[in-house]
């Protein structure tokens, strides 16, 4: 009889532990979901090539109007300015970015940048609906200059034809040759008599417009941005 009572007590204790553990487990999933939902997405970095003094990360796709595109998911593509555009414009005073819900067309006007009373249009590298706008660059355009391929991104677009759009852009060796041609074109606008060099210690200077007469700014930018 004594052994029987011990067995019953052991079984009862085990059942109690199971019941307590069950209730504890049913109260945990909400906390786990919050952690999962708030987790930052893993950043993907690419090797950065230096082409004629300008940064040109591998793994991105480039529009010949000097905007980059990076696919983030099946149809979502993030867009920004390349290093050439940023260094050409120098200090950006204002940005006019497309609002959420606006439909962009590949190769057509996407946004406008302003400097010193001059306004410069740029072309969208991707067609689709704007689903996100970077508030940081609207508050402080200098963010673009500090990190054009990272925190200085402009907008994200939901593009149903993302893959076919990206095939129209430049990558790899083609992108490098295009960058070299853009730099060569810029050289034609810089008078040798000024004694100014586009590069400073291997990298392009950070305010290329400043070495050009202001009355030529808009013509030079339109030619290079294809706008």
Tell where the protein language model's regions lie, with residue ranges:
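Contiguous, well-folded functional domains in the mature portion of proteins
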Residues: 2-227
């Amino acid at each position: 009889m004594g052994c029987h009572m011990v067995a019953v007590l052991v079984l009862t204790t085990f059942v109690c532990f199971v019941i307590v553990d069950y209730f504890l487990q049913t109260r945990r999933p909400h906390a786990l979901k919050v952690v999962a939902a708030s987790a930052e997405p893993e950043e993907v970095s690419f090797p950065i090539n230096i082409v004629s003094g300008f940064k040109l990360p591998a793994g991105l796709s480039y529009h010949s109007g000097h905007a980059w595109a990076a696919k983030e998911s099946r149809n979502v593509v993030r867009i920004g300015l390349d290093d050439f555009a940023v260094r050409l414009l120098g200090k950006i005073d204002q940005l006019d970015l497309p609002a959420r819900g606006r439909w962009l067309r590949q190769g057509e006007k996407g946004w406008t940048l302003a400097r010193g009373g001059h306004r410069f249009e740029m072309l969208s590298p991707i067609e689709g609906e704007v689903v996100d706008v970077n508030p940081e660059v609207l508050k402080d355009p200098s963010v673009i200059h500090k990190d054009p391929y990272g925190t200085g991104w402009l907008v994200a677009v939901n593009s149903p034809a993302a893959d076919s759009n990206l095939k129209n852009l430049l990558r790899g060796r083609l992108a490098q040759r295009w960058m070299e041609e853009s730099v060569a074109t810029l050289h034609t606008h810089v008078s040798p008599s000024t004694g100014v060099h586009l590069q400073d210690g291997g990298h392009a200077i950070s305010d290329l417009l400043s070495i050009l007469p202001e009355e030529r700014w808009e013509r030079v930018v339109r030619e290079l941005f294809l706008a």
